[in-house]
From Swiss-Prot:
One of its GO terms (molecular function) is tRNA binding. Binds directly to 23S rRNA. The L1 stalk is quite mobile in the ribosome, and is involved in E site tRNA release. This is Large ribosomal subunit protein uL1. One of its GO terms (cellular component) is large ribosomal subunit. Part of the 50S ribosomal subunit. Belongs to the universal ribosomal protein uL1 family. NCBIfam families: rplA_bact. Keywords: Repressor, Ribonucleoprotein, Ribosomal protein, RNA-binding, rRNA-binding, Translation regulation, tRNA-binding.
């Protein structure tokens, strides 16, 4: 078992073995995020689904009201005049078969891959490279589209794709330690609503299992999911 560093051990003593109210949990996470850089705040949510069944898979996108605080590199595989449109819209990498070949050779210098439908037969051949990294374009995720410019704009502005992994756990980066706890909660609430809205049709029993938040270099804190779901803004 890996031994905790002195810093992590000290931070862990500030966290009680209980479920926390959302804003209290976020306050603790922010307080513990004292590294020499602006730590990323993450959510790790275990759902009552078994993704090996197609009707229990979760993969979708959400636009967080305060963005993620991160800049992402977007690659676009398209053809014809759409290549210049991708460049004009701010894509970091763009091309046709040349980009397909580059990726196939190991060029993975991007965080998100968008493709137009006409290029998907060629992109499909990259499944071995893209699949394990969760980068294969998908219509449900908004990454297979003819509206390249709008897709790039939305993802650059904070739209993000998330999915449940093989264990039914959703991992999402939803802000930075420099965000206010209220902004972090707004993002978290939006994420919760998206997960509920996109509940797989085959999900059985208890849908929400556990809900933890953490920072890049800090310990995790368990959230009260009911308090997140039941929250109603004043007025």
């Amino acid at each position: 078992m890996k031994k905790l560093s002195k810093r992590m051990a000290a931070l862990s003593t500030k966290i009680e073995d209980r479920i926390y109210a959302p804003l209290e949990a976020l306050s603790i996470i922010k307080e513990n995020a004292n590294a020499k850089f602006d730590e990323t705040i993450e959510a790790h949510i275990r759902l009552g689904i078994d993704p090996k069944y197609t009707d229990q898979q979760l993969r979708t996108t959400v636009v967080l009201p305060h963005g993620t605080g991160q800049s992402i590199k977007i690659a676009v595989i398209t053809s014809g005049e759409n290549v210049s449109k991708a460049k004009a819209a701010g894509a970091d990498l763009f091309g046709e078969e040349d980009l397909v070949e580059s990726i196939n050779k190991g060029n993975m210098e991007f965080d998100l891959l968008i493709a137009t439908p006409d290029m998907m037969p060629k992109v499909a051949k990259l499944g071995r490279v893209l699949g394990p990294r969760g980068l294969m374009p998908n219509p449900k995720a908004g990454t297979v589209t003819n509206d390249i410019a709008n897709a790039i704009k939305e993802f650059k502005a904070g739209k993000l794709e998330f999915r449940a992994d093989k264990a039914g756990i959703v991992h999402v980066r939803f802000g930075k330690a420099s965000f206010t706890k209220e902004a972090l909660f707004d993002n978290l609430k939006t994420l919760q609503e998206s997960i509920d809205k996109n509940k797989p049709s085959g999900a059985k029993g208890k849908y929400w299992k556990t809900f933890y938040v953490t920072s890049t270099m800090g310990p995790s804190v368990q959230l009260d999911i009911n308090a997140v779901q039941d929250y109603q803004p004043e007025g």
